Amino acid sequence: MKKMSDKRKRQEGRGTGTEKDYKPYIQAREVNSLGTCSNPIDWKTGRTVQLLSQGEDALWHILRWNDDIIDIREQYPLDLKRTFKIAGEYGIQHPGTNPMTTDFLVTMRNGQMIAYSLKPSKAVLEDKRTVEKLFMEKTYWVTQGVEFKLIFKTDINTILYNNIRLVVPYYKAEKVHDDASVIKHLIATKRIPIDMESAPLKVRLLKQEYEKEIALWRQRNSKLATF
């Protein structure tokens, strides 16, 4: 797909809105790395999310799993005048004439905001240009009182990521169709305490362990539980 101009994106309201009404500045179909892009559905808001890499997909799932986070805005555009000013003050070449973006701008339940930048590994810090752009991004947020966090894909807990991906398709009760999906629903809605970080979930064993909880859920949701 042909890249869209900044003017056109602004006209479409890209980078505006919150929660289910947020419109990311960049959409997955607009980048060349389509093989690693993904469009998961936010199980809490129903919005289609625009993620540009496998690392972004992993980090987004982990952030979304955190109930202290109430909003995640991906591909968030930075104010062009501010970034040009930062570039000028520190003698850094601005990356093009279009807005820079932050991978994720997160809003916490307590009102705190955190900006996340994701990189593949610490090896990228050996590249001077990458460090310059990260410095600009960090300066942009810190000067506005927003915490900035740099995350490396190599540090992401893939067990947690895969476990989250396993259960969240059953977040809504109407998606439940058998005992295995009941367990996944109960985990996704955090009605049963499960260690998600240490080992892959074994649904067969969990069905045995939480047999009473499954029966109780079916009893309370008899209109949905037709299996």
Model-derived segments and spans:
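Electrostatic, structured charged patches in enzyme active sites and in nucleic-acid/phosphate-binding
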Residues: 1-227
